[in-house]
Amino acid sequence: MPLESFLIASPALVGDQLYVGTHTGLIVCVDWRKGEFVWKYEAPRKMPFHASAVVSEDLVIAGGHDKQVHAVQRSTGKIAWTFATRAKIECSGALIDQRFFVGSGDGNLYGIDIRTGMEIWKYNAGRDITAGIAIGEGCLVVGEDQQNGRLLCFS
């Protein structure tokens, strides 16, 4: 199925629906069994989505090169909220309950309430966060330092 753009982000799959961000600033929902688009969300600034999308019960959430986290309604593809950072986002986020965690090129790891799109937690790592986030039993782990490979673990 042609997306008219190349992909860097990995797709998220829930049932028959596949969600992925593109290099041309789209987040798309595809019915992979039918090979048809369900919806397309176009970010206003049309900048790349290199971070993989995370899917909750109601939302599809992804960070973009436009320095924004975009949350779109899973059923319609309409924007629910955006959250601004100070640099592009290449880090794939993670969802814990009703909280979305994502790192940014501004050196911050953010915790966002997915019901409101509001910041509920922030940690300044001092350097770009580009590695994806891993969730374990009672902890969140992210690689922070591109120079020496430092891992940060939050419990």
Question: Where is each model-derived feature located?
Answer:
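Short loop/turn segments that connect beta-strands within beta-propeller blades
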Residues: D31-G35, Q73-G77, D113-G117, S155
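Glycine-rich phosphate/oxyanion-binding loops and their immediately adjacent helices
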Residues: G21, R33, G63, S75, ...
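WD40 beta-propeller blade core
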Residues: V28, H70, Y110, R150-L152
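Extracytoplasmic beta-rich repeat domains
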Residues: M1-V14, H23, F37-S56, H65, ...
